[in-house]
Amino acid sequence: MRNNHIVIMAGGVGSRFWPLSTPEYPKQFIDILGCGRTLIQLTVDRFKGICPMSNFWVVTNAAYVDIVKRQLPDIPAEHILAEPAARNTAPCIAWACWSIKKEDANANVVVTPADAVVMNPEEFRRVIGNALAFTDNNNAIVTIGIKPSRPETGYGYVETSLTPNPSPKGEGNEILAVSSFKEKPDHETAEKYLKAGNYLWNAGIFVWNIDTITNCITKYKPLIAEQMDKIVNDLPSDSTCYTLNSKLEEVFPQCEKISIDFAVMEPASKDAIVYTHPADFGWSDLGNWASLHDKLSKDADNNGAVGNVKLFECNNCVVHAEDAKKVVLQGLDGYIVSEKNGQILVCKRSEEQRIREFSAE
């Protein structure tokens, strides 16, 4: 446990949840479920018992550092990594892993987004524990694959072998070899994936030991590795690699803007070192209002609401009005209603893909 580290990626802006989520205060820092905890706090909660608080790391936008400190006061301030520029997930993860390796050469690491929802944290911890045991004993990358319940077109997929991995050291009987990664499919292809039985949703949660990931980045993206050496390893002994400094501000924005999936996962899967742990712990990436409606408790008319909300003759609505003193709605069918800081959205659920357009007006 003392060598386990958790990296939380918390730099996104969550523009599909406007007006709840804004560039100044995005969804990972909001109590979007109305449970008294923000999404990033829930993320930390579900990892408790897997590693000490001193081994948590957060990579975020420089503008959000103070929010992270307020919401997660037990995480060491030097473990809050402030990106000077958004360069997608590969440089973000590389920076965190190079920083961890400098502190703990025997680290075993879990990387997770800050804004996912897990309804069964006990099962989540069991799955993560299995994956950590596997990567502790193997030169392997494990991605958590969610067992699909529907032909979802909004997620990427992981194609797996149909039998457990052939030669694990230590625990790993539930872990399968990954054949390939698939981009978000159309509905017909998603139907085929569901019927095939060997495709899982890619949850964007990764587990590896520190040598495996740093070696992979060095092999597949050597320039990013060189840049991380400059940022983390080439600093003078009295400096810090965690806060904004001249070396970081100079080098990090030069990193290739690329996801960890394209930078590492796809080439590593061709080298047969990528595995997946199938899981069913009530996961959602909470990427849109439809997914929030799915996770909220519903009344008899299929309405989900957060806040002091009164509904009359309403059906199939999702309402979030935590800041408002009281919201009363009548006669709506299939609407999103949201209020935050004096801004109000009323939108048909069938038109939610236009919310970014509306918020830009």
Q: What is the predicted function of each stretch?
A:
Residues 40, 96, 115, 158, ...:
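Residue-level signal for inorganic ion chemistry
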Residues 121-168, 172-239, 243-249, 254, ...:
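Conserved core of the sugar-phosphate nucleotidyltransferase
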Residues 1-9, 15-23, 33-113, 119-129, ...:
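Conserved N-terminal catalytic core of the sugar/cofactor nucleotidyltransferase
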Residues 86-91, 150-152, 187-189, 283-284:
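A short acidic, often aromatic-flanked loop/helix-cap motif at beta-alpha or helix-coil junctions
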Residues 2-4, 53-54, 76-77, 104-107, ...:
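Short coil/turn connectors at secondary-structure junctions
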Residues 9-10, 59, 110-113, 143-147, ...:
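Short beta-strand segments
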Residues 2-3, 212-361:
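Left-handed beta-helix
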